[in-house]
Amino acid sequence: MPDAVIIGAGYAGMSAAALLSHAGRKVVVLEESERVGGRARSFRDEEGYLREYGAHSHRLAHKGIANEVFKRLGEEIDFLPESKDGKLIFRGRLWERPEGPIGFLKTPLLSIRARLVLLALFAKIKKTDPADWYHRTLLDFYRASFRNPEVEAFLPFLGMTIMCPDPNKVSAGEVIDFLKRVLAAGVGVGEPRGGSAGIFQTLSRHIDRGGEIHLRERAEKIIIENRRVTGVKTGRAIYPAPVVLFAAGLPLIADLLDQTLLPAAVEKYAKNIEHSSGLVIDFITNRPVTGIRSGILGVDVPIWARFQSSADPSFTPAGKYLSTWGIMLPWHFDGDASVVAGAEQKMKSVISAVFPDFLPAVVDERKMVATVMNGNVLTPAQSKPNRPDVECPGIEGLYFIGDTVRGDGCSGDISFSSAMKAADKILSDRKP
């Protein structure tokens, strides 16, 4: 009998399974798709391209939360050498991305007066406890002390760092928490060599030492008796276990158990989670279109880009070059094809403005609509204090992990963090 069953093989599920297996626990990972990775999955196609479900960076690189999981496993993520050539798109132009307070003081992005206001804002952020501002927006935080139209127009950049560019929507506490960690770490993001494939290969190796990964096997029911988990039922088998970690999006939990067993607050939260969506396009060219090795973020348009082949030739066959561009779709995107077409037109218009020779050089492209990009938009209502804890109240042995629960950080970091939190609780509460 396994010590734990993990439902879902994304960042959270695979990390938790690896940590538990590393500690000597027997685990079974259930994944309904044909490969591990969830929203960070990747594969090499028949032509030799490494395809990813979007491009995934890791905040704070070797000092970040993802690498903390690996350190616990006695490993390190193999990050590409840090590059300082990141760019911003603002007002239809490409700008050098400022690095640290000195960089923002010198940037021609803003007037001298606006730069000084922005530095004062950063100083205030460094002194502020995020806990005081989780329930207010970034715009609220800014307007409590400052008034400058240039800086206000630049605020989406701060929100975009945690993938919620609207300053009137994003939680100030979440932005403050992230920026304080960036300022302390002195590093922005890290790109793993070979993309996310290497991340999951390492996690799989640790799981295989004392556990199993079952692909194409969908969990149908979490078995609960007297408010205590006793196992998981799939279409193939029943897996008795004293611990179940649900590592899929929290809204899906209702499909696997009697909702009346959930605390009312958890049930309500799960039903009302707001996620983000995006359009991602992989562009292939026969020649380099830029030497940029780092990434690009949009300030006044919610766009981002990576030029993988500039830094890591393993992504493509010889003589081919890959770059991935993404643009956020409107909030509450409902699948409307005309909205996607409009977003694609906007993306390509921006590309043409900042790289006039780029699109004419494209020989192939792959479009993907990420219906769920970030499972949890970091609004005040969905900020860290308001998300459900990893340990389900009222159901012994049930844990929630992933980017929709109370982990630290943002996006994938929440998944890695929640996996560590759950593993710590399980290992401290249940001795072999």
Predicted regions and their residues:
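Helical element adjacent to the flavin cofactor pocket in flavoenzyme catalytic cores
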Residues: 178-230, 234-235
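C-terminal segments that line or cap access tunnels to active or ligand-binding sites in enzymes
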Residues: 275-373
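N-terminal Rossmann-like FAD-binding beta1-loop-alpha1 element of flavoenzymes
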Residues: 2-29
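A conserved beta-strand/loop capping segment in the N-terminal third of enzymes
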Residues: 41-50, 59-117
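FAD-binding beta-loop-beta segment adjacent to the flavin cofactor pocket
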Residues: 312-318, 370-400, 404
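Rossmann-like flavin
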Residues: 84-95, 101-177
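Mid-domain catalytic core of redox enzymes
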Residues: 220-321, 389
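Glycine-rich FAD pyrophosphate-binding loop
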Residues: 21-46
